[in-house]
Amino acid sequence: MPLHTPQPVWRYAVFQISAACLAICLVLALLAGQLGWFPRLVAVHLAVDLSGSTYQSSLANFNKPGTIMAQEIEAVQAYATRNARLSQPNLISVSGFASSVVPITNGFSSDPQEITRAINQVVQPSLVNRIGGGTNMNLAVENGLSTLKTQPTLCTEMLVITDGVFNINPEIIEQVQAHNVRLNFLIVGQPLTAEINQWANQTGGIALEVSPSSITELLSEEVFERFNANPLVPLFYGFAFISFMWMMLLPLERFFNQALRIRIDYASKVSVYNAIFWTIATPIYLIASGLFNPFQSC
């Protein structure tokens, strides 16, 4: 039976219900994306490279302004400061690594002042005697994983900031995957290799190349926003789009019939098939593109 009637389309239930669903979904997307409703609960471990190359292998330059080390620490503090403004701040843990690993924070904290005090207390020139000057990425990742395993109920992100050339044992990457930890990299002043990209992609993380002067901006903006992106926002927008397609059922039918001179029964079928197509295609697109994963809560 044709959907077309001479009455205005907004007087029919299919239009009204679809319009209401569209409005609700858009409001939910706004609340989740802009106002912080339904936030992800995230634990973040920041592994900071403190090897010799970050201070030009000279104790006189240890954590001095302009060095990579100073830029890394400034970036961590900027992340912690912005994080404190969230309604549900990330729990942050920080470690430093070179030939060995040293914890900088005592467990997790969302207090930027506490994190800054811990950094000032631990990151001193005498630290070189404890951690050496190399880059042992296996130890850095294993330590970060052990730390994040203490927060099993939260979404877990590990970020490694390094200017070194390194390798990671495959079994360590497998352990990271097994515990649903996303491994992310900021590679400072070095080319981003295919292997680093692969390690990040395997665990659902990202790998970015960055200049020393841009570490703070990248960490406190792009990386921060990615860690705190709400996975429900694409879902709400997807439902909004589906609702819009159903809301357009009668308007499309009338357009096909009156503007394109298609028979009313065919116009009705085309408009219904169009709505059904987008109802099926939209969730497939969201899942295939990685915008939404129904099998993961993070």
Question: What is each residue range found by the language model?
Answer:
Residues 51-54, 76-87, 123, 144-152, ...:
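Sec/Tat-exported extracytoplasmic proteins
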Residues 57-69, 101, 105, 123-134, ...:
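Second-shell loop/turn segments in exported
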Residues 211-298:
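C-terminal "exit" segments of structured domains
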Residues 128-132, 138-139, 155-157, 162-222:
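VWA/integrin I-like adhesion module and closely mimicked acidic/polar interface patches used
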Residues 41-47, 52-91, 107-114:
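…and closely analogous acidic/polar surface helices at protein-protein or active-site interfaces
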Residues 2-62, 298:
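Acidic, polar low-complexity linker/tail segments
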Residues 46-50, 96-98, 162:
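Flexible glycine-/small-residue-rich
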Residues 38, 56-58, 85-125, 137, ...:
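Short beta-strand-loop
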